[in-house]
């Protein structure tokens, strides 16, 4: 079979992924951090090792790595929390996933936020000067950028955009679902407040993390 949907989910996985999942379910599957017995301790070691590996890969503090069932859930938790805390001027890229746009549309229809797309030129490249003009006119509370589009493949100049956003004291959220482990990005820098990615795409892992 020829498989061409890797931008949605990579397949097949490396053999070690299948073996590790089988090993975990048969011999580890305890509740992480909720018991003082062998299975629970083994699960904690796996989680701690995974955090350390992600720290090496993405240059982020291991203790700031949080696991959720999906990138969609992670994005929703972050966006809802920030809006509930009072953020109203939300800027997004023109290439956001439905996990972002539908959540923001929900709040916008409730009168709890205004959503504006960051400016791109006719070649679909970000226009930093025009984005600065946008921020000058309406100060951002939250700037959300998809690191790469899984439709057209455009990689956003995220450091430029987020550095500009920080001049206006905005929170920043990077959707790395398409790029984690594939495109180098130092999310340990102060310009990154939140970064979300999935295990089942470019990290070649299973779904559900």
Residue spans for each PLM region:
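Pyridoxal 5′-phosphate
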Residues: 1-209
């Amino acid at each position: 079979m020829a498989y061409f949907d890797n931008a949605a989910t990579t397949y097949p996985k490396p053999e070690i992924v299948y073996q590790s999942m089988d090993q975990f379910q048969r011999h580890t599957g305890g509740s992480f951090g909720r018991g003082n017995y062998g299975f629970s301790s083994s699960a904690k070691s796996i989680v701690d090792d995974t955090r350390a590996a992600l720290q090496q890969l993405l240059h982020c503090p291991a203790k700031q790595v949080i696991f959720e069932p999906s990138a969609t859930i992670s994005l929703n938790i972050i966006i809802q929390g920030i809006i509930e805390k009072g953020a109203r001027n939300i800027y997004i890229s023109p290439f956001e996933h439905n996990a972002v746009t539908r959540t923001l549309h929900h709040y916008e229809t409730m009168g709890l936020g205004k959503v504006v797309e960051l400016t791109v030129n006719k070649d679909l490249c970000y226009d930093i000067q025009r984005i600065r003009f946008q921020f000058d006119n309406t100060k951002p509370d939250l700037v959300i950028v998809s690191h790469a589009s899984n439709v057209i493949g455009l990689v956003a100049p995220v450091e430029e955009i987020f550095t500009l956003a920080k001049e206006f004291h905005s929170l920043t959220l990077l959707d790395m679902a398409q790029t984690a482990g594939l495109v180098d990005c130092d999310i340990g820098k102060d310009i990154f407040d939140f970064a979300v990615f999935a295990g089942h795409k470019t990290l070649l892992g299973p779904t559900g993390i």
